[in-house]
Amino acid sequence: MNRGGYSWYNAPMDTQEILRALTALRASAMPGEYDLHRMVAEAFKAAGLPCAHEYRLAPHRRIDFFLGGVGVEIKKGRPNARQLLRQVERYLACDELAEIIVVTQKVTPLPARVLGKRVTNVSLDRLWGVALP
């Protein structure tokens, strides 16, 4: 949990740069969740986007990646939409998070805004299909 100090990963970030890095991902047919974490971390590094991995927003609220006010949460498969929405609400209730990008393997419907903050869903299966082994 950042107490207001400036760090390399909490400088304001351009969401479009983050989305460009994420849309370059090509997932194999059955990646594990931590394989997806590794791929996302590598995509951010290749794009020159500093980030914090497993960032603690508050007690019991640890988002997968934090990039200057933008959170990125990764879910393998097709998560339960209701549970995912509750998790997104908990994260977006934190002042430090201005918006969230949810990366899922399968399309999972989420509202465009939660608590007045933008929610963007990136489906890996829609990024030109899944790369077969």
Describe each region flagged by the PLM.
Residues 2-12, 121-133:
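Non-catalytic C-terminal interaction segments of nucleic acid-processing enzymes
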Residues 5-56:
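Acidic-basic catalytic patches of nuclease active cores, encompassing PD-(D/E)XK
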Residues 41, 88-89:
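Short amphipathic alpha-helical segments and helix-helix/interface helices
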Residues 45-49, 67-70, 94-98, 116-117:
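Short glycine/proline-enriched coil/turn segments at helix->beta-strand junctions
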Residues 56-68:
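Catalytic centers of nucleases
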Residues 58-59, 84-87:
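Amphipathic coiled-coil/heptad-repeat helices and related helical stalk/stem segments
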Residues 65-78, 91:
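Conserved catalytic cores of phosphodiester-cleaving nucleases, focusing on short active-site segments
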Residues 78-83, 92-126:
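Nucleic-acid nuclease catalytic cores
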